[in-house]
Amino acid sequence: MDKSGSPNASRTSRRRRPRRGSRSASGADAGLRALTQQMLKLNRTLAIGRPTLNHPTFVGSESCKPGYTFTSITLKPPEIEKGSYFGRRLSLPDSVTDYDKKLVSRIQIRINPLPKFDSTVWVTVRKVPSSSDLSVAAISAIFGDGNSPVLVYQYAASGVQANNKLLYDLSEMRADIGDMRKYAVLVYSKDDKLEKDEIVLHVDVEHQRIPISRMLPT
C-alpha cells in the first residue's frame, strides 16, 4: 500500500520545508552585518579627523591646523567698578616665548558659560602700542573705535551663557609668538561692579609646534 498520501507523510513533508522564521532571521542577520560594515567604515572615516598629538583639538571644539598646537593662559581681572575698564597684556610662559619666531594663527577667549554675576561684560583682544599704559582712558578709546570684535557676556535667564567664546584669526597678519606681548585682553564692566575673581578668562594661543612635548594637549 502506498503511504505517500497518508496524513503522516504530509505532515513530515511540511516539517521539512524551511520555516518563515528561519528566513526572517537570516535576512535580519544579513542586514545587521551590512549595518555593522557601514558603521565600521564610518568609524574609520571619522578617525582620520580625530585629534592626535600632531593635530590636537583646539579648545575641545575644533582641531588645530596641521603642525600647530596651543598654549592656554588664565586671567582673573581684579575688582572693576561699574563703567570702568581693565586691561592686561598677553604673557606666555618662557618655555614658549623662547621660540618667538613661531607663527601664531589664532587667539581664542573663553569664559565660564555659567556666569555668577548679572552684569554685562565686554571682552576683546587688541594689539596695543608698547607705550600704552592700558589706563582707563586708553582702553575706553580702544573699545570706542569699533575696530575689533567684542564678546558681549551677560546674565542669561536660563543660567547658561551660550555665547562664551571669541576667536581672532591672525594667520593673514603673519603674527608670531614674539608679537603676543603687543596684544592685550581688555574688559569693560558695563552695568555693575565686577568683584575680584568673579570672572575668569581663558586665553588660548594657537601657534606652530615647538619641541616641548609637555606643551601638547592630550
UniProtKB/Swiss-Prot annotation:
- Cellular component per GO? ribonucleoprotein complex; T=3 icosahedral viral capsid; viral nucleocapsid
Q: Which UniProt keywords apply?
A: Acetylation, Capsid protein, Ribonucleoprotein, RNA-binding, T=3 icosahedral capsid protein, Viral nucleoprotein, Virion
Protein name according to UniProt: Capsid protein
Q: Where is the composition biased (Basic residues)?
A: 12-22
Write out the function statement from the record: Capsid protein. Probably binds RNA and plays a role in packaging.
Provide the positions where the record notes the PTM N-acetylmethionine. 1
Instruction: Print the organism lineage.
Output: Viruses, Riboviria, Orthornavirae, Kitrinoviricota, Alsuviricetes
Principal place where this protein is found? virion
Q: Name one Pfam family in it.
A: Cucumo_coat
